[in-house]
Amino acid sequence: MWRRCLRLRDVGRRLLNLPRSGLTASEGLGPKLPTPIRAYVPPAERKRFYQNVSISQGEGGFEINLDHRKLRTPQGKLFTVPSEALAIAVATEWDSQQDTIKMYTMHLTTLCNTSLDNPTQRDKDQLIRAAVKFLDTDTVCYRVEEPETLVELQRNEWDPVISWAEKRYGVEIGSSTSITGPSIPARTREVLVSHLASYNMWALQGIEFVVTQLKSLVLTLGLTDLRLTVEQAVLLSRLEEEYQIQKWGNIEWAHDYELQELRARTAAGTLFVHLCSESTAVKHKLLQG
């Protein structure tokens, strides 16, 4: 895979001065779309219309080229990303498409579109508070009272993650069997808001995306801090579902598809956060892990 990435990078460096006509990142040659009222939803499949994918460096960052035309966002903006690593990852998404372009599999492209167009028109503070609000309904904080086997499973699997987060950030989170959930101290919210404020807007888009997939800020922090793997975080977010499946069985194809999709979205969002973060140390640790 990295050979392909290096090839894309080398080709991209030879295409620094291409014409500025472009293709939309959601539909290629499609029309400019109006601003939606929520985050982008990838469109349906369409036939692949390009042969080669490359990256190039422009004034605003790194660009994606499909043949000799520059990729653009659904709102018609030049598709420009802040790092070469992210550009290579996005280019790989486009290059890996076969006869049919399946935009719903191109999570990095969708996250870039959201970051560039900001269809929900939210600022940094709003993104942060949307993520922190998930503490009120965080998956790992809600506990059942029965059956005892599930109570014990939640305690054994979720308590260590909560304990890690409390120690890592110096806060209190806790858990509850109440329908209203745990009472999160105001200081905990303040500390986590301050922590998330250290990320840039692009990374915050990725963080909120992962939080909405896992329904958990605690698990998302474990991922971004490299405390959990994607597989671990997804399993922990689905603990009760997996328990019920083990007990009652499941429709195999449906379960497998849902699980793989959740892993793919979570992995893409986590990678997006790291590739958009300003800390090169974090990126190096991610690549070496």
From Swiss-Prot:
**What membrane topology is given?**
Peripheral membrane protein
**What SUPFAM superfamilies does this protein's entry cite?**
ATP12-like (SSF160909)
Could you tell me where this protein is found in the cell?
Mitochondrion inner membrane
Q: How does it assemble?
A: Interacts with ATP5F1B; involved in the assembly of the F1 component of the mitochondrial ATP synthase (ATPase). Interacts with FMC1.
What the protein does comes down to: Plays a role in the assembly of the F1 component of the mitochondrial ATP synthase (ATPase).
Please give the family membership noted in the entry. Answer: Belongs to the ATP12 family.
Name under which the protein is recorded: ATP synthase mitochondrial F1 complex assembly factor 2
Q: Which organism is it from?
A: Bos taurus (Bovine)
Report which gene this protein is encoded by.
ATPAF2
